[in-house]
């Protein structure tokens, strides 16, 4: 099916209640999945631009724009190499890191042959270089990174089949699986260290993590056992429809709470526009 032409809108607020939107990226293609990165002097917006008419046939490119004054934005340029998609850049030890996925396999390749996720590093948020390959195959894509301390990095990966989270030690050249493998896929993963606890969110099915809300899809909240990689379910975020949901963003606020944003949409219907709301909530860590 054909894909729509989206653009990237940034919203700002001084009280997290009243928001002012403005467009920061609008190319001739379908712009989607924006990610923010704040450095000392700039605010970067990375977004995936889908090139082509068909969703399955379209190729991707990550574009970047930035501001130094909060009002004027640079023209979007390629953030890295054509075909790579950035997922949630992180600041660590004076530099910036991002997991970038690319699929260079031919269309006829099997699921096991599709996909590769690489770890990239930048000193300024604009120029990136490859550090290592995090994983390959199994249609790997969206990968959330969380730094535990001065030497440990965990990657939680969206794949067609389930896989254990991976861990790497500085300088992050090699990756090893943690012991536990979840019994569900990690769709739209988001992980953050809040105090000394890793909180994690992804899209889940209510048949596995049941509640009394409508529909079948949920934005699940978990705590991670960093020794084993096990994800302990805590609760599901509120939903109006249980249709198209998730893609959370988690912002730690001190050591005992976090802001979490996610979208809550009506069930997908081919060729029809459906309502989708952005939700914002506070999680208190006990």
PLM feature spans:
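Beta-rich carbohydrate-recognition and catalytic domains
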Residues: 1-32, 37-188, 192-243, 253-259, ...
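Signature of short aromatic-glycine-proline-rich micro-motifs recurring in repeat-based ectodomains
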Residues: 247-249
């Amino acid at each position: 099916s054909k894909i729509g032409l989206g653009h990237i809108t940034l919203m700002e607020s001084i009280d997290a209640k009243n928001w002012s939107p403005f467009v920061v990226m609008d190319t001739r293609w379908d712009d989607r999945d924006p990610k923010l990165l704040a450095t000392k002097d700039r605010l970067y917006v990375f977004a995936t631009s889908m090139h082509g008419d068909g969703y399955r046939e379209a190729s991707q490119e990550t574009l970047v724009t930035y501001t130094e004054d909060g009002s004027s934005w640079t023209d979007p340029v390629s953030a890295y190499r054509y075909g790579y998609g950035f997922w949630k850049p992180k600041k660590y030890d004076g530099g910036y890191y991002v997991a970038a996925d690319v699929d260079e396999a031919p269309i006829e390749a099997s699921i096991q042959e599709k996909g590769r996720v690489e770890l990239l590093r930048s000193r300024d948020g604009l120029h990136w270089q490859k550090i290592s390959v995090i994983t390959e195959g199994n249609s790997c894509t969206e990968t959330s990174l969380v730094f535990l301390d001065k030497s440990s990095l965990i990657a939680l990966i969206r794949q067609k089949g389930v896989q254990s989270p991976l861990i790497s030690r500085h300088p992050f050249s090699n990756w090893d699986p943690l012991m536990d493998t979840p019994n569900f896929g990690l769709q739209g993963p988001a992980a953050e260290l809040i105090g000394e606890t890793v909180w994690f969110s992804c899209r889940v099915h209510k048949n596995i993590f049941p509640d009394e809300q409508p529909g079948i899809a949920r934005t699940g909240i978990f705590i991670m056992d960093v020794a084993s990689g096990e994800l302990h379910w805590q609760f599901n975020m509120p939903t109006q429809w249980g249709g198209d949901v998730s893609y959370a963003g988690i912002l730690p606020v001190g050591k005992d709470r976090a802001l979490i944003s996610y979208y809550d949409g009506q069930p997908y219907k081919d060729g029809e526009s459906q309502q989708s709301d952005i939700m914002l909530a506070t999680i208190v860590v006990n």
